[in-house]
Amino acid sequence: MPTIQQLVRKGRRDKIGKVKTAALKGSPQRRGVCTRVYTTTPKKPNSALRKVARVKLTSQVEVTAYIPGEGHNLQEHSMVLVRGGRVKDLPGVRYKIIRGSLDTQGVKNRKQARSRYGAKKEKS
């Protein structure tokens, strides 16, 4: 434990918390290029083939990003926009690809929560 004199001289240092989306370097989103598009299986009680992509960001960091929604048009060398947000049942996936921006198309026939999936309003 420090003495009062030591605290007067140095003071206390604040602890620096760990950032959950370090690869974004403080930005809300980052652009990147898909290096690999593949499917992976989730953690124990769940069962599916989740669509994910390895993305090399403009911050020179390569991350694994989830592709939300049903169906996608992504392939290698596609330009994508990546945001933070983990997928609970996929270990190591801490980023999501934004649908409807750059090379990523929106989800077809989406009626609800359209803005999250880049789907345009249907003409009635």
UniProtKB/Swiss-Prot annotation:
It comes from Mycobacterium marinum (strain ATCC BAA-535 / M). GO terms for biological process: translation. GO terms for molecular function: rRNA binding; structural constituent of ribosome; tRNA binding. Belongs to the universal ribosomal protein uS12 family. Transmembrane segments: none annotated. GO terms for cellular component: small ribosomal subunit. Pfam families: Ribosom_S12_S23 (PF00164). With S4 and S5 plays an important role in translational accuracy. NCBIfam families: rpsL_bact (TIGR00981). Part of the 30S ribosomal subunit. Contacts proteins S8 and S17. May interact with IF1 in the 30S initiation complex. Keywords: Methylation, Ribonucleoprotein, Ribosomal protein, RNA-binding, rRNA-binding, tRNA-binding. The modification 3-methylthioaspartic acid is found at residue 89. This is Small ribosomal subunit protein uS12.
